[in-house]
Amino acid sequence: MRQKLDRLLEQAQINLTDQQKEQLVGFVRLLDKWNKAYNLTSVRNPDEMLVKHILDSLVVSEHLQGNNFIDVGTGPGLPGIPLAIANPDKQFVLLDSLGKRITFIKNALRELGITNVTPVLSRVEEYKEQTFDGVLSRAFASLNDMVDWCYHLPNPQGKFYALKGIYAESEVQEIKNPIGLEKVIPLSVPELVGERHLVLLNKPN
């Protein structure tokens, strides 16, 4: 699995240390193990997890601006855990409303020695503890839902980072809250079939 990860990272031009690579492989092994009992992801094959979960998360890394981020509807820690491993200097809150997912994340953090992640069991609309430089998600079906439910989370300079498949301009026009479209970045994920985009949105000051 490590060789496959090395190859994917090279193709994506992502540079990580040996320790970071081992943490990513360890995370996939844990996810695969827990998935058999807890059904955390529909992806069953660890090699596929490397592409669809790890690389698909890591390609966002170079676009992150700021120091503290929240991953909303993180599921088993995606994209939050791969991004936290790749960015040990940044802080991440991983939010999910399902207990088994947060239990898995806590276990993974402990086993892998990841110290820059805070897992939180909460519904997004009820989480008002702090604001963030970036609100990340690949969980929302529509941009309007993401902005609507997470509007209280970015700080004045903060941005929404929405990970999408196909980007539809009409989705931005359907957003009800005041919002600015900063840019849409096509993402290239090695060995992943289909389009991926990062949509950057900001709240007008």
Swiss-Prot record:
S-adenosyl-L-methionine binds at residues 73, 78, 124-125, 138. GO terms for molecular function: rRNA (guanine-N7-)-methyltransferase activity. It catalyses: guanosine(527) in 16S rRNA + S-adenosyl-L-methionine = N(7)-methylguanosine(527) in 16S rRNA + S-adenosyl-L-homocysteine. Keywords: Cytoplasm, Methyltransferase, rRNA processing, S-adenosyl-L-methionine, Transferase. GO terms for cellular component: cytosol. Its EC number is 2.1.1.170. It is found in: Cytoplasm. SUPFAM superfamilies: S-adenosyl-L-methionine-dependent methyltransferases (SSF53335). InterPro entries: rRNA_ssu_MeTfrase_G (IPR003682), SAM-dependent_MTases_sf (IPR029063). It comes from the Bacteria. PANTHER family: S-ADENOSYL-L-METHIONINE-DEPENDENT METHYLTRANSFERASES SUPERFAMILY PROTEIN. Belongs to the methyltransferase superfamily. RNA methyltransferase RsmG family. Specifically methylates the N7 position of guanine in position 527 of 16S rRNA. This is Ribosomal RNA small subunit methyltransferase G. It comes from Actinobacillus pleuropneumoniae serotype 5b (strain L20).
